[in-house]
Swiss-Prot record:
Main location, first listed in the record: cytoplasm
Protein name: Phosphoribosylformylglycinamidine cyclo-ligase
Lineage: Bacteria, Bacillati, Bacillota, Bacilli, Lactobacillales
Keyword terms, alphabetized: ATP-binding, Cytoplasm, Ligase, Nucleotide-binding, Purine biosynthesis
Similarity annotation: Belongs to the AIR synthase family.
Gene this protein is translated from: purM
Amino acid sequence: MANKNAYAQSGVDVEAGYEVVERIKKHVARTERAGVMGALGGFGGMFDLSKTGVKEPVLISGTDGVGTKLMLAIKYDKHDTIGQDCVAMCVNDIIAAGAEPLYFLDYVATGKNEPAKLEQVVAGVAEGCVQAGAALIGGETAEMPGMYGEDDYDLAGFAVGVAEKSQIIDGSKVVEGDVLLGLASSGIHSNGYSLVRRVFADYTGEEVLPELEGKKLKEVLLEPTRIYVKAVLPLIKEELVNGIAHITGGGFIENVPRMFADDLAAEIDESKVPVLPIFKALEKYGQIKHEEMFEIFNMGVGLMLAVSPENVERVKELLDEAVYEIGRIVKKENESVIIK
């Protein structure tokens, strides 16, 4: 008992940690899928790859966090969707390589274990996993007094997926003449928030700006990142997509060239980009140069596909949502991305 009291006096609440584990079990259970072995709480999560039915499996992994969007979740005391952001950032990256997400692990570090709040965070992670078809097979909650303030926490995630070796998407199939199709984003997603916070530093979040179509600012800023897995997987299975770009930090300019060879470029018709109201507000209130917006944000397109012209109609048919023909692949002359 003396040791327990000593640890508690140093700021670590072991009992609260146990409570967190008990609270999250029901959320983790929602994510179970074929291949999961063992139960939550072991030293390592286990997954039986043979259950996927993939003949020549290649594992593809990704890790990410949600950046300073967390600071807005803390500021507005809304923690139930930030976990979905974390999952989205990881699984959208690996789907861009052709991988079906299999499982996910999360890492939460906090200054003080608050079981109710941490349950909300993990519930959001679980919801993201359900949307991605990934099992939440493990994680870590680290209470680190002195490292973080009592109300602060950080969140990171790790996704592992599998692809058929012949269906890996690595940019080698993208050719001149391919059509660029944009899939809508849900909002800012999880990048550019250091700038977003500066632009809206003097706002409470309760404001309904005229550009935001009746929504409160805080609702728009914390809109969870869209997860594209279930929309895009059927396209990968039918081998209809030559390249995929997840539009994250660096916007169009940094991310689109990652899906094709150095001798190619993306020519984008700006008038076809479905720019969301929040980006118009950011440009206006932040006095950001228009061309710079495309270097920072997704501008309304969270995922971009390079598709052979003869496959465009089939892709649209399978997606069953608004699909934006925003450009094409051309031979590179100077820039890798040309926005007209």
